[in-house]
Every structure is written in structure tokens, then in C-alpha cells.
Amino acid sequence: MNIEEDHIGDAIRQSAGYLGHFHIGECNRKVPGRGHMPWDEIMRALADIRYDGAVVMEPFVKPGGQVGQDIKVFRDLSGGADEAQMDAMAAEALRFIRQKSKEAQK
């Protein structure tokens, strides 16, 4: 939706009743909260349609592996993070998205 749509919130609202699985990530492929996606707008739109399906983070920050090769990740966007640091980034992003979702429910 980020690339194809003029207004992501409206696109989400138009998908009401059809949206069954929502993948999230930043425009720069990093975890949510480390880019410039309009998370307030996105979470408000999901709240507006009462979306209660899966929300799955899909950051692609390290080259290598089958997925990294398939999507052509050619540089390390993690800052050289090890597995523990990657886990910490994922936990931070989860807290960020949960907070944005909570704020959107108000």
C-alpha cells in the first residue's frame, strides 16, 4: 500500500472487510519506528475499520540467507547488530506499534 496508494489511511479504510493479514515495515526496510511511515495514520485507519487480524513486522535489514538474496538486500541496515541486538530492535518496534495502536483506539 505504501507505494501504490496516494493516501495509505484511505486505502486501509477501503480494504475494510477484505484485509486479513497486515505486514508492516518502514520504507527503508527497518523495524517500525526507525523510518518515516505515517504510523499514527496507519493505526488510526486500522482502528477505524476495527481490524483485528494479524499484524506482522517484516524488516529486512541484513543481507544473506534465502530471503535476503531473493529481495536483493545488499547492505547491512542493522548497524552491525548481533542476534541479541536484533531481538532488542524487534522488541522496541513491538512496543512502538502497540503504543501507536493504543493511541489510535482513543
Regions found by a protein language model. Give the residues of each.
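Histidine-acidic metal/acid-base catalytic patches
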Residues: 1-106
